[in-house]
């Protein structure tokens, strides 16, 4: 995994009240120290604090900002992170990003912040996938499903099954190594019950995945009927 420091605009590229430029990586604090002018040096600031000041490119003042300082590992990516809250005009946000890149960061690739969060153990694959699902949710049900996955509902189920499998695998291996002291009488029935239970849970997960896809993508439906049969009324109800 690359250890360089990345930066990107975290808000939409339209004129708005506020724009955010995020920096993540080992050099995040060194970079912000080069371009931020305020009451204190942000590399010395406490984690999870916000500071008022200005972003400067040499002697030129770019914008008046609030800067959030977050130290690893208690961040989204698991790395040192800085978020620059500036005015949301597209030009000024891009100018702030250009200044950050000029001072040592590189432009983040699409999805790279989430990728780093995954690689640094801040989330598992199901949660990483849920991030984009939350962003692209088109209805309340899809959002609720995606948020549940992001909060770890799928992860917990998989982890419980994994623990169950590891427990019984360890028991079987121990029994094979020491058959004189470990009895396996009746264990076959227990193992069968456990295995069947895990298979049912896996089938439920697969089924819920299919249901989730319908919630997120919807169902293509055609309403067909004779003229004045009530097709429009039915569509309006739906």
Which positions does each model-derived feature cover?
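Long, non-coiled-coil amphipathic alpha-helical linker/lever segments
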Residues: 122-201, 205
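A glycine-rich (often HGG/GG-containing) alpha/beta subdomain
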Residues: 1-144, 148, 152
């Amino acid at each position: 995994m690359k250890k360089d420091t990345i930066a990107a605009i975290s808000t939409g590229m339209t004129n708005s009240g506020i724009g955010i430029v995020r920096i993540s990586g080992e050099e995040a604090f060194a970079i912000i120290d080069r371009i931020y002018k305020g009451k204190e040096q942000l590399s010395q600031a406490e984690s999870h604090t916000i500071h008022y000041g200005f972003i400067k490119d040499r002697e030129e003042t770019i914008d008046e900002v609030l800067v959030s300082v977050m130290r690893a590992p208690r961040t989204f990516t698991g790395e040192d992170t800085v978020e620059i809250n500036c005015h949301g005009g597209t030009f000024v946000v891009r100018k702030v990003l250009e200044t950050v890149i000029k001072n040592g960061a590189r432009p983040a690739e699409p999805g790279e912040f989430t990728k780093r969060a995954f690689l640094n153990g801040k989330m598992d694959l199901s949660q990483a996938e849920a991030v984009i699902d939350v962003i692209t949710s088109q209805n309340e049900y899809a959002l609720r499903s995606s948020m549940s996955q992001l909060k770890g509902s799928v992860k917990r189920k998989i982890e419980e099954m994994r623990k169950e499998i590891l427990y019984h695998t360890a028991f079987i291996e121990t029994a094979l190594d020491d058959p004189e002291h470990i009895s396996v009488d009746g264990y076959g029935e227990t193992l069968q019950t456990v295995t069947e239970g895990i298979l049912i849970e896996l089938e439920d997960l697969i089924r819920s995945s299919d249901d989730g896809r319908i919630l997120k993508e919807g169902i293509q439906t055609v309403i067909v009927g004779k003229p004045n049969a009530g097709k429009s009324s039915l569509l309006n109800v739906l």
